[in-house]
Design a protein with these regions (language model features):
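Catalytic-core regions of core metabolic enzymes
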Residues: 1-712
Length: 712
């Protein structure tokens, strides 16, 4: 039996199919006095729409050269979608008319809704309620609409970049309509075609996540590009990203904003370490979303992936006619994390037989200025270069000619020889410009003739795109983690360090034993029973960071030292925090010897839910802020990836004579801490273990703190 969620997802997908593939459109509020109406109507001809367009105007008459219906109901035939361009005060009436006509897809250009404040938000809620009561799929309000380039369906209210590049494979989704236009314009200038261009605006109904979910199944779309200001449906976006990764459709995303979510995290460290932006960054790493920071990198990365797809062998061969460009490319490849291996001796020998006497067979390969005299040098050098067993992808730097005259001349011949060399090499290959430059129609024709994958990206953006494409391919090969059943719900609500450590122990996390004492004599007796040096820590529900106020003493041994330590801790804390309630003092065995202190902290993000941060712990957690983050639940394998991402990762493998920790044991402990936090339910604000002491023989929680929502 299908789940309700599956039925809802199918209904949503069907709704978007009806919208994005509409064959008849009503232009509600059509008037030749409006630039929006003029552009929207002109786009049907510009894009080659073959369906029917129905202007709707209260005054009737002729609008845009067609007879205008006075209402949607007066059109007199079924209509797939409506574009509402009426003033805000007329939207409700226009929507009711659209509903009466049985139109079940709407794009609302009109602004004046949630973006203007509380009153506008109430109007938007009423609009959404009207849409849902009639089963209407609503895009907007306050959006420019969409263009389905693949099926030639434009419900878009500004002029798109022309001419349309056929066969576009990148679906662009943006919460900002203007930014969607900027992305489309830049892609068009670079000769990179789009399959879709969608502005979601206020996202009263259709949001970015729903459009991504649609594009994952769209046959014309090979890559998805996003511009996000916020995320309105994080669970669906995460699920869609997982489906995209499984399907081999990369998602390249710009997300603006880096605000913190720490306000409700009480005094826990985790709130300052896990913020909105850092959680989104973690989501990208976890789900294979390629995050970029500018339109250029979005377009070039998506354009590269649309052309070369998944690259299995991620070792790069660099080729240029310039030694200086070769050196720049090598530097940028290293910065992008791309391996540029040395060539094998047989490859060097084969290249010596081809290159001029002054040429040197290296990777990067400078084919030398000899190619200016004999363009076939590219066609003769690329096959032996590409045959080297250490290479997986070839990147050759050469600007694409702009004009028909150049293409017919020597510059065009060089590109043709590069194309011949690429084909003969048997390797995936891409040609990159030396500096960022547009691609003309004549240039696109030459690329089609030579079957060359090309980016007019320049060296830096091009190598960055290759690095990101390689990282995405590597992430995809690791696969999408299998869904894990939620952990068994805990029936306790631990408060205080002692109870939290005991709870972690019950969930399979090794934790140091602690005993609460209320007098110096009890402290001494407990220490003697432990039979070695001890740690004393203040126990108070009002104090999270004990060491800051003298609430922790280490390595105490002997009755006198323990008794004196008890008195000193109590006196110090009472002087620093006289208002704090004191439960007593905790006594724990002192752990000596080699080891690394780690930090593991869980925080419930308001958008994405529970997330876990792992980093170097103890006093370094705030000083270094060196953490890796993932959404929960995590597997031990994912935690191993997190540990490898830390800037201080080399400390885990032994440093200056100290033994390496057991990373697998540490990862198991962190994964169990994450499961333990999930089991405590939504009232948990944060759960921290600091430090989690990792050694060559295992991992042990030495201190823990749970913070609860007082209203939960």
């Amino acid at each position: 039996m299908r789940t309700k969620a599956a039925v809802v997802q199918d209904a949503a997908a069907a709704g978007l199919d009806g919208l994005f593939r509409a064959r008849s459109v009503a232009l509600v509020g059509a008037t030749e006095r409006s630039i929006w109406s003029q552009a929207a109507f002109a786009n049907f001809e510009r894009l080659g729409f073959t369906g029917r367009v129905h202007p709707v105007s209260r005054k009737g008459g002729t609008v845009h050269g067609l007879p205008a219906a006075t209402s949607c109901a007066a059109i007199g035939e079924p209509v797939d979608a409506a574009l509402l361009m009426v003033p805000e005060q007329a939207v409700a009436e226009a929507f009711a008319d659209m509903n009466a006509a049985g139109i079940r897809n709407a794009v609302v250009l009109t602004s004046g809704f949630a973006e203007v404040g509380a009153e506008g938000a109430r109007r938007q809620e009423a609009l959404l309620a009207a849409a849902r009561s009639e089963g209407v799929t609503l895009l907007g309000p306050n959006c420019l609409g969409f263009i389905n380039y693949a099926d030639r369906v434009p419900i878009w209210t500004t002029q798109p970049p022309l001419p349309v590049i056929p066969g576009g494979a990148i679906g662009v989704v943006s919460q900002s309509g203007a930014t969607a236009g900027f992305i489309a314009a830049f892609a068009q200038r670079q000769g990179i075609g789009l399959s879709h261009q969608v502005s979601t605006g206020n996202e009263a109904d259709v949001n970015v996540a729903r459009v991504v979910d649609f594009l994952v199944d769209d046959p014309a779309t090979r890559v998805i590009g996003l511009f996000l200001e916020t995320v309105h449906d994080a669970p669906l976006l995460a699920a869609s990203a997982r489906r995209a990764l499984s399907a081999g459709k990369p998602i390249v995303a710009i997300k603006i904003g880096a605000s913190e979510t720490a306000a409700r995290a009480a005094e826990a460290h985790t709130g300052s370490l896990v913020g909105d932006d850092r959680v989104f960054e973690a989501v990208c790493r976890q789900l294979g979303v390629i995050r970029v920071s500018c339109i250029e990198d979005l377009v070039f990365t998506a354009g590269l992936l649309a052309q070369v797809g998944h690259v299995g062998d991620r070792r790069l061969g660099l080729v240029s006619i310039s030694g200086g460009v070769c050196e720049m490319a090598a530097d940028h490849a290293e910065a992008a994390g791309v391996a540029v291996p040395r060539l094998a001796e047989p490859t060097e020998a084969a290249l010596r037989a081809v290159l001029p006497a002054f040429g040197t067979p290296n990777n990067p390969l400078d084919v030398t200025g000899g190619a200016m005299l004999d363009a076939s040098l590219f066609a003769r050098s690329l096959p032996p270069f590409g045959a080297d067993p250490s290479l997986g992808l070839i990147a050759c730097f050469m600007d694409l000619p702009d004009t028909a005259e150049d293409i017919a001349g020597y510059r065009g011949e060089i590109v043709r020889q590069i194309g011949a060399g690429f084909r003969a090499s048997g390797r995936p290959a891409v040609m990159l410009s030396v500096m960022t430059r547009p691609v003309t129609e004549a240039g696109r024709a030459l690329l089609k003739e030579t079957e060359i994958a090309y980016l007019g990206s320049g060296v830096q953006h091009g190598l960055g795109a290759i690095g990101r494409a390689f990282a995405w391919a590597e992430r995809r090969e690791r696969g999408v983690p299998a869904a894990r059943p939620p952990p068994t719900t805990a029936m306790v609500r631990p408060a205080g360090e002692q109870a939290t450590l005991a709870y972690l122990t019950s969930r399979g996390v090794r934790a140091t034993p602690v005993t609460l004492v209320r007098s110096a004599a009890e402290a001494v007796a407990t220490a003697q029973a432990l039979g070695g040096p001890v740690v004393l820590k203040i126990a108070s529900p009002d104090i999270a960071h004990k060491s800051d106020i003298g609430g922790v003493l280490l390595d105490l041994e002997g009755a006198a030292a323990v008794a004196d330590g008890f008195d000193r801790i109590v006196a110090s804390v009472r002087a620093a925090r006289p208002e704090a309630a004191l439960d007593g003092v905790l006594v724990a065995p002192m752990r000596r010897g080699n080891g690394v202190e780690l930090f593991a902290g869980v925080l419930r993000d308001p958008l994405w839910g529970p997330a876990i941060a792992v980093g170097l712990g103890g006093i370094w957690v705030e000083a270094l802020r060196d953490t890796a983050i993932r959404l929960l639940p995590v597997t031990p394998g994912e935690v191993l990836e997190m540990l490898s991402e830390l800037r201080g990762a080399k400390l885990l493998d032994g440093y200056r004579g100290s033994p390496a920790i057991d990373r697998r044991a540490a990862a198991e402990a962190v994964a169990r801490i994450g499961d333990a936090a999930l089991a405590l339910g939504p009232a948990l604000v944060s759960l921290e273990v600091n430090p989690l002491r990792a050694t060559a023989t295992g991992a042990e929680a030495l201190d823990a703190l749970a913070v609860w929502d007082e209203e939960g």
